[in-house]
């Protein structure tokens, strides 16, 4: 075989082995840019379609599908008028070709439902339901493809535009509209989706911070080297899957400051350019680390929600400076698997939103049964309203804040109380804190936790993996995370344990003395604490800043992250401020933070306990002078432990610490855990948990029994043996002593 023949053979072989896969098509209809999904929604007719239209492009024509039969010929025009109002994807140009489910109801097959548009109506011939709305019809196959409207990300909030695939994975939405150094985002028609009890987020468009893994998507964490080093994710994390399962449509990945550390534009943002804050003169700091999330919600009406994370203020900061809703929930409400950590001890996922009703529905979808919602019953509102470090009355935003406080106090039927956290600490601080002030106790706590945790969990494996494929080189890292990691390296390993101890000291003090949880499930929080996180002043991005330093100090915004309490931002209004950039008066938002007690449901979650119980439990209390049950039913066990005489007592707070442990494998379906325990208890004079009546601690060993039931491991009983007690342990539970002694 000659050289030319060999070349031709190899070229042919290479061609035969290649594949051509469609990734969608971009079209323009009446001056509006669209993306035609590569995935068919189904056939509206069998075979090709002969349609006389001037709109045919690449075999696609715009079409409207009407799937239901709840219409008449006379109501179609009002239906289309309503569609123009509720949907930004559909437009009258889609009316040239209409497919209707109940074709026989129409007597006129050619009609003008909109001025200037002549409609041809065809029967909808399908065996499965195609949602109503705008589509692009492939005239050769009779298949309709969903229409996505394309928008320019002019605020620079996104890193990737995504398309959800039918198999649950994601791929890049391959389209670009005319723009200057910004990407294009595609959104599907809202008409395709119907909200139901099972799908309360159906059709809700969401952007996701670039630290959450999505199946089929490469994650960057704000670092170019990271993005190019690691492959696409194989699975979607629990938090994002919760939203998808409830109907959410994820349209793109959004910018984060690098590795979710706090960065200031513009110098700190080296690998990627910081998103733009649309408020004021348009050149203000968007705050971080959920910068893309905040910027997008403040900039785009076509986006409904953005998912961010809050470790030290990464949601609340962007919400504050851009005048939108944002929340840091109680810590630990949802798993953060497949999420890049700053510190698991502090990380929480939350939302940035414009619509409080949608915000509420999203919270319920994300946090599931750990989210308390009073939509179906009347709550009892707390009567304590604390004001923390409110601005002086002569500041521009003070009147707006005071107006809100006045209305809230009236609604709660209470009076606000100014609180000095430092004085309260000095008056009631635990003895183990010594003479330290809050500022002294917590000065390095945040810096120590995030620098030590992230260096171990993120930097070390990242550096190792990068070096393995780049001849031992180090990847580039922005100045802020690098400065924090470097400082952490210079500190002793004991710094982290000291920081965790100090955080716990503050958490126990705050949750016991300032905002204890309420025993009333219709109240949850004993009070509300209001503080102001922003001053309605310009913080421009066109300024030179000093080199980064570790985040030392303690501020009111850190209360919730150390106490693990919810802290939500509410926009209230705006104030005029003169801009030297525009040489004009612009407006900046005014917001307020509302802190509540750590979720009551997290203190005693009986539903979660019931779910892990075996049908029958072996309960042996003979070693502590009580009875033994060889086969106590799960319901009886729940009734016993949740009784007011036992763990259900709202005046008792308990904490169990596990020490040494070993496991005994009895069989394939039974295991015994041998645990060393310290059970600490405090009894309060009332359910507000303000005043301690007595303490009682028990040191014990405990056998916990576990059995496999229907393939799932369940808790099947316990056998405690007390070694010694401290204080008045015998008087902790009301069921442990005589009626005459009860809480006298």
From Swiss-Prot:
<dbReference type="Pfam" id="PF02982">
    <property type="entry name" value="Scytalone_dh"/>
</dbReference>
<dbReference type="InterPro" id="IPR049884">
    <property type="entry name" value="Scytalone_dh"/>
</dbReference>
<dbReference type="GO" id="GO:0016829">
    <property type="term" value="F:lyase activity"/>
</dbReference>
<dbReference type="Pfam" id="PF01425">
    <property type="entry name" value="Amidase"/>
</dbReference>
<comment type="subunit">
    <text>Homotrimer. Each subunit contains an active site, located in the central part of the hydrophobic core of the monomer, which functions independently.</text>
</comment>
<dbReference type="InterPro" id="IPR032710">
    <property type="entry name" value="NTF2-like_dom_sf"/>
</dbReference>
<dbReference type="InterPro" id="IPR036928">
    <property type="entry name" value="AS_sf"/>
</dbReference>
<feature type="binding site">
    <location>
        <position position="702"/>
    </location>
    <ligand>
        <name>substrate</name>
    </ligand>
</feature>
<comment type="similarity">
    <text>Belongs to the scytalone dehydratase family.</text>
</comment>
<protein>
    <recommendedName>
        <fullName>Scytalone dehydratase-like protein Arp1</fullName>
        <ecNumber>4.2.1.-</ecNumber>
    </recommendedName>
</protein>
<feature type="active site">
    <location>
        <position position="681"/>
    </location>
</feature>
<comment type="function">
    <text>Scytalone dehydratase-like protein; part of the Pks2 gene cluster that mediates the formation of infectious structures (appressoria), enabling these fungi to kill insects faster. The product of the Pks2 gene cluster is different from the one of Pks1 and has still not been identified.</text>
</comment>
<dbReference type="InterPro" id="IPR023631">
    <property type="entry name" value="Amidase_dom"/>
</dbReference>
<feature type="binding site">
    <location>
        <position position="621"/>
    </location>
    <ligand>
        <name>substrate</name>
    </ligand>
</feature>
<feature type="active site">
    <location>
        <position position="656"/>
    </location>
</feature>
<keyword id="KW-0456">Lyase</keyword>
């Amino acid at each position: 075989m000659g050289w030319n023949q060999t070349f031709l053979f190899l070229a042919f072989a290479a061609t035969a082995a290649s594949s051509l896969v469609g990734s969608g098509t971009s079209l323009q209809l009446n001056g509006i840019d669209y993306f035609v999904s590569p995935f068919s929604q189904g056939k509206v007719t069998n075979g090709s379609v002969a349609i006389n239209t001037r709109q045919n492009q690449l075999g696609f024509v715009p079409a409207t599908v009407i799937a239901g039969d709840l219409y008449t010929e006379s109501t179609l025009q009002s239906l289309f008028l309503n569609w123009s109002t509720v949907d930004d994807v559909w437009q009258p140009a889609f009316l040239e070709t209409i497919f209707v489910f109940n074709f026989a109801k129409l007597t006129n097959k050619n009609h003008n439902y909109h001025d200037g548009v002549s409609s041809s109506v065809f029967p909808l011939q399908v065996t499965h339901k195609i949602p109503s709305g705008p589509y692009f019809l492939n005239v050769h196959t009779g298949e309709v493809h969903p229409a996505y409207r394309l928008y320019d990300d002019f605020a620079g909030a996104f890193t990737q535009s995504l398309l959800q695939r039918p198999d649950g994975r994601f791929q890049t939405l391959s389209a670009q509209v005319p723009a200057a150094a910004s990407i294009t985002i595609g959104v599907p028609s809202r008409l395709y989706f119907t909200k139901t009890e099972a799908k309360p987020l159906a059709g809700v468009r969401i952007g996701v911070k670039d630290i959450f893994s999505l199946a089929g998507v490469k994650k960057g964490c704000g670092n170019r080297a990271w993005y190019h080093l690691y492959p696409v994710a194989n699975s979607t994390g629990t938090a994002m899957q919760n939203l998808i399962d409830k109907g959410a449509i994820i349209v793109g990945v959004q910018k984060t400051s690098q590795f979710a550390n706090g960065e200031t534009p513009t110098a700190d943002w080296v690998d990627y350019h910081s998103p733009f804050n649309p408020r004021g003169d348009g050149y203000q700091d968007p705050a971080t680390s959920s910068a893309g999330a905040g910027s997008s919600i403040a900039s785009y009406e076509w986006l409904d929600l953005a998912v961010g994370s809050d470790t030290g203020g990464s949601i609340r900061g962007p919400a504050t400076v851009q005048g939108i809703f944002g929340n840091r929930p109680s810590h630990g409400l949802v798993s953060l698997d497949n999420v890049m950590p700053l510190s698991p001890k502090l990380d929480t996922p939350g939302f940035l939103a414009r619509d409080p009703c949608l915000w509420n529905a999203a919270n319920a979808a994300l946090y599931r049964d750990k989210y308390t919602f009073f939509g179906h019953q009347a709550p009892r509102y707390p009567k304590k309203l604390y004001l923390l470090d409110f601005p002086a009355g002569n500041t521009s935003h003070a009147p707006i804040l005071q107006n809100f406080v006045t209305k809230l106090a009236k609604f709660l039927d209470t009076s606000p109380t100014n609180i000095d956290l430092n004085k309260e600490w000095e008056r009631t601080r635990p003895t183990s804190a010594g003479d330290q002030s809050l500022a002294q106790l917590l000065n390095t706590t945040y810096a120590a936790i995030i620098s030590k945790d992230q260096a171990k969990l993120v930097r070390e494996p990242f550096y190792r993996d990068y070096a393995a494929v780049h001849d031992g080189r180090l990847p580039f890292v922005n100045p802020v995370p690098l400065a924090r990691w470097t400082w952490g390296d210079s500190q002793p390993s004991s710094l982290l344990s000291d920081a965790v101890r100090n955080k716990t000291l503050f958490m126990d003090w705050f949750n016991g003395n300032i905002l204890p949880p309420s025993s009333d499930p219709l109240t949850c929080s004993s009070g509300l604490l209001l503080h102001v996180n922003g001053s309605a002043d310009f913080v421009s991005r066109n300024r030179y800043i000093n080199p980064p330093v570790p985040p030392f100090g303690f501020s009111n915004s850190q209360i919730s992250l150390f106490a693990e309490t919810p802290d939500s931002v509410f926009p209230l209004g705006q104030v005029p401020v003169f801009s030297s950039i525009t040489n004009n008066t612009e407006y900046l938002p005014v917001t307020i933070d509302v802190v509540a007690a750590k979720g009551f449901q997290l203190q005693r979650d009986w539903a979660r306990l019931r779910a892990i119980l075996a049908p029958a439990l072996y309960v042996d209390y003979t070693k502590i002078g009580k009875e033994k049950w060889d086969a106590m039913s799960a319901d009886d066990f729940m009734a016993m432990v949740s009784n007011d005489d036992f763990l259900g007592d709202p005046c008792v707070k308990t904490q169990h610490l596990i020490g040494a442990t070993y496991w005994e494998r009895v069989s394939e379906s039974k295991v015994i855990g041998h645990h060393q325990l310290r059970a600490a208890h405090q009894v309060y004079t009332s359910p507000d948990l303000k005043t301690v009546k007595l303490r009682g601690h028990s040191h014990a060993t405990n056998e916990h029994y576990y059995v496999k039931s229907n393939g799932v491991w369940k808790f099947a009983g316990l056998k405690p043996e007390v070694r010694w007690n401290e204080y008045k342990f015998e008087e902790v539970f009301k069921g442990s002593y005589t009626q005459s002694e009860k809480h006298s």
